[in-house]
Amino acid sequence: MVQQESRLKVADNTGAKEVLAIRVLGGTKKRYASVGDKIVVSVKEATPNGSIKKGAVSTAVVVRTRKEVRRPDGSYIRFDDNACVLLGPQGEMRGTRVFGPVARELRDKQFMKIVSLAPEVL
């Protein structure tokens, strides 16, 4: 569960390491983002030679949350951190690699590129 002012790890190779959630996209009353939801983020920590610089504003999709996500079969999935993947202006991935596991819910939300690049889909 991610909300405004939440800090997330970045799970791709764009050069950003940590971002701050500015806004949850998807309506005026949407307060929390879960796995597969889009958010607007500001880069708070970045590597010196990365393509994304500190202070840059971008959209991102949440790929892991510490808050458990309920599946249709009644099971739950939970991760050790909150993480996202940065997106470009047309909704495509900005990076070329994805680090760490991602949730299967991304497949249902049509983020096939992220699912195919992830080392593990849980």
Curated annotation (Swiss-Prot):
**Could you state one GO biological process linked to this protein?**
translation
GO cellular component annotations, sorted alphabetically? Answer: cytosolic large ribosomal subunit
Entry-linked PROSITE patterns: RIBOSOMAL_L14
The family database entries (SUPFAM superfamilies) matched by this protein are listed as:
Ribosomal protein L14
TM spans (from-to): none
Q: Which residues form a coiled coil?
A: none
Q: Which GO terms describe its molecular function?
A: large ribosomal subunit rRNA binding; structural constituent of ribosome
Going by the UniProt record, its keywords in alphabetical order are: Ribonucleoprotein, Ribosomal protein, RNA-binding, rRNA-binding
SMART domains, A to Z: Ribosomal_L14
Family designation: Belongs to the universal ribosomal protein uL14 family.
Quaternary structure and partners: Part of the 50S ribosomal subunit. Forms a cluster with proteins L3 and L19. In the 70S ribosome, L14 and L19 interact and together make contacts with the 16S rRNA in bridges B5 and B8.
Function recorded in the entry: Binds to 23S rRNA. Forms part of two intersubunit bridges in the 70S ribosome.
Q: What is the official name of this protein in its record?
A: Large ribosomal subunit protein uL14
Tell me the lineage of the source organism. Answer: Bacteria, Pseudomonadati, Bacteroidota, Flavobacteriia, Flavobacteriales
